[in-house]
């Protein structure tokens, strides 16, 4: 059957398509501005702009930036023409968009939890560092949570966990490639010499298990949202 016959990815139970488009476009614009300002600041203040893509935080924030841009395009085309761009794509692209949605509703929470629980140094040295870290390690999860609650998306299939774990494994490989080529550990808890292989493996398994738990919790929120907004409140989505 059709991938998304009632256009759940492009509509909201609360906002009109035009308002949802504006919201998503605004978030994408802010996220891209924050990303490029961070690159510019680090590049001109003796920072690590050249190592930006080695950090899971930054990769996840790039993902959020592009997701909201693509989601805005889908919602905008639905708003203007009645047929979203997503509906015109081949099925495999539609499935990739669904997986994309799963990544941006799981990975930001992992980033936030790991940073504040393990990596946060206790203070920020500059106002800029406070702003960007708050954006990338706190607002990222706010953006993700709103994208869970606001649209009409349904629960994701459980097989989406497989590409999520695969992407985490790919990042783990990237972290050690960075160690081999750049000479530093992106995250201190990945340092085998300092922590021991058992501790590092424990961190990796804990993050993988956390991915499962967050995925399940997010699906629970989506299930509750669908039940409350559609079955109880009778809001089947604003289509115009």
Language model regions located:
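Non-transmembrane, juxtamembrane loop and terminal tail segments
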Residues: 1-10, 231-240
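Membrane-interface transmembrane-helix boundary segments in multi-pass integral membrane proteins
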Residues: 15, 19, 182-218
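Transmembrane alpha-helices of multi-pass eukaryotic membrane proteins
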Residues: 16-31, 50-67, 71, 92-108, ...
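Aromatic-anchored segments of alpha-helical transmembrane domains
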Residues: 32-36, 110-117, 167-177
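Membrane-lumen (extracellular) interface motif
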Residues: 35-59, 116-135, 148-162, 177-198
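Transmembrane alpha-helix/helix-exit interface in multi-pass inner-membrane proteins
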Residues: 72, 102-124, 172
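Transmembrane-helix exit/juxtamembrane "anchor" motif
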Residues: 72-80, 213-235
């Amino acid at each position: 059957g059709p991938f998304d016959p009632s256009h759940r990815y492009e509509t909201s139970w609360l906002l009109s398509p035009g308002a949802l488009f504006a919201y998503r476009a605004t978030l994408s614009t802010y996220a891209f501005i924050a990303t490029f300002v961070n690159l510019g600041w680090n590049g001109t203040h003796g920072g690590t702009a050249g190592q930006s893509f080695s950090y899971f935080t930054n990769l996840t924030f790039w993902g959020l930036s592009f997701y909201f841009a693509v989601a805005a395009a889908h919602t905008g085309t639905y708003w203007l023409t009645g047929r979203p761009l997503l509906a015109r794509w081949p099925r495999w692209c539609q499935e990739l968009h669904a997986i994309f949605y799963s990544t941006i509703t799981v990975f930001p929470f992992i980033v936030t939890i790991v940073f504040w629980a393990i990596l946060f140094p206790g203070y920020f040295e500059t106002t800029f560092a406070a702003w960007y870290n708050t954006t990338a390690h706190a607002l990222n999860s706010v953006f993700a949570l709103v994208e869970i609650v606001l649209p009409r998306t349904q629960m994701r299939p459980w097989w989406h966990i497989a590409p999520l774990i695969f992407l985490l494994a790919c990042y783990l490989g990237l972290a050690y490639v960075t160690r081999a080529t750049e000479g530093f550990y992106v995250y201190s808890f990945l340092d085998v010499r300092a922590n021991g292989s058992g501790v590092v493996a424990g961190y990796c398994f804990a993050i993988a298990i956390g991915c499962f738990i967050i995925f399940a919790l997010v699906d629970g929120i989506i299930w509750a949202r669908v039940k409350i907004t559609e079955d109880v409140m009778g809001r089947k989505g604003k289509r115009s």
